[in-house]
Amino acid sequence: MFRLTSARALFRVANVAARRTYAEAAADALKLNFALPHETLFAGTAVKQVNLPVKTGQIGILANHVPIVEQLVPGVVEVLEGSESKKFFVSGGFATVQPDSTLSITSVEAFPLDSFSAENVRALLAEAQKNAGAADSRVAAEASIQIEVLEALQAALK
C-alpha cells in the first residue's frame, strides 16, 4: 500500500516537472514601455521595431531580440508601429530588453523630433560654444554637455 501511494506521488511530481519543461511560443511582437519621470509615452504597446542610439552605435530591436541592457546617448529613438514611424529625441537614458520581448526605455527627457526648430538649435549651440571657453569650470562643463546634446539634435534635424 505504501509503495503504491509513493509511486502515485512520484508520478504526479514527475508529470508536473515534465509539463514545466515545454518551451513557450515565441513572441510575434515587441512590447514597448517608454517612460519619463513625468509621463509614460508607451505602456506595453505592441510595435514592430525600435531603433536606439546607444553608446556603441545605433541598434534596432525586434521581437525575440537577445536580452540586453544598453546606455542611451543623445539621439533619436525611432518607434515603428506597422507603417507608422514616431521619432523622439532623447538626451540619454537606458534600454532593457527582457526575454519575453519586452523593451523598456527610461529617459529623463524625450520630445517628438518635429517639435524642434533648426534655427533655435543653431542659436543655442552657438551660445553653448561661447560658454565652453568660460573661466568658470562649472559653466564650461555645463556648456560641453549642452554642446553634445545640441550637436546630436542638429544632426537629427538634417
Curated annotation (Swiss-Prot):
<dbReference type="Pfam" id="PF21334">
    <property type="entry name" value="ATPD_C_fung"/>
</dbReference>
<dbReference type="InterPro" id="IPR036771">
    <property type="entry name" value="ATPsynth_dsu/esu_N"/>
</dbReference>
<keyword id="KW-0066">ATP synthesis</keyword>
<comment type="function">
    <text>Mitochondrial membrane ATP synthase (F(1)F(0) ATP synthase or Complex V) produces ATP from ADP in the presence of a proton gradient across the membrane which is generated by electron transport complexes of the respiratory chain. F-type ATPases consist of two structural domains, F(1) - containing the extramembraneous catalytic core, and F(0) - containing the membrane proton channel, linked together by a central stalk and a peripheral stalk. During catalysis, ATP turnover in the catalytic domain of F(1) is coupled via a rotary mechanism of the central stalk subunits to proton translocation.</text>
</comment>
<keyword id="KW-0406">Ion transport</keyword>
<dbReference type="GO" id="GO:0045259">
    <property type="term" value="C:proton-transporting ATP synthase complex"/>
</dbReference>
<dbReference type="InterPro" id="IPR048938">
    <property type="entry name" value="ATPD_C_fung"/>
</dbReference>
<keyword id="KW-0375">Hydrogen ion transport</keyword>
<keyword id="KW-0139">CF(1)</keyword>
<keyword id="KW-0472">Membrane</keyword>
<dbReference type="InterPro" id="IPR001469">
    <property type="entry name" value="ATP_synth_F1_dsu/esu"/>
</dbReference>
<dbReference type="GO" id="GO:0016887">
    <property type="term" value="F:ATP hydrolysis activity"/>
</dbReference>
<dbReference type="GO" id="GO:0015986">
    <property type="term" value="P:proton motive force-driven ATP synthesis"/>
</dbReference>
<comment type="subunit">
    <text>F-type ATPases have 2 components, CF(1) - the catalytic core - and CF(0) - the membrane proton channel. CF(1) has five subunits: alpha(3), beta(3), gamma(1), delta(1), epsilon(1). CF(0) has three main subunits: a, b and c.</text>
</comment>
<dbReference type="GO" id="GO:0046933">
    <property type="term" value="F:proton-transporting ATP synthase activity, rotational mechanism"/>
</dbReference>
<keyword id="KW-0999">Mitochondrion inner membrane</keyword>
<keyword id="KW-0809">Transit peptide</keyword>
<dbReference type="InterPro" id="IPR020546">
    <property type="entry name" value="ATP_synth_F1_dsu/esu_N"/>
</dbReference>
<keyword id="KW-0496">Mitochondrion</keyword>
<comment type="similarity">
    <text>Belongs to the ATPase epsilon chain family.</text>
</comment>
<dbReference type="GO" id="GO:0005743">
    <property type="term" value="C:mitochondrial inner membrane"/>
</dbReference>
<keyword id="KW-0813">Transport</keyword>
<protein>
    <recommendedName>
        <fullName>ATP synthase subunit delta, mitochondrial</fullName>
    </recommendedName>
</protein>
<feature type="transit peptide" description="Mitochondrion">
    <location>
        <begin position="1"/>
        <end position="22"/>
    </location>
</feature>
<dbReference type="Pfam" id="PF02823">
    <property type="entry name" value="ATP-synt_DE_N"/>
</dbReference>
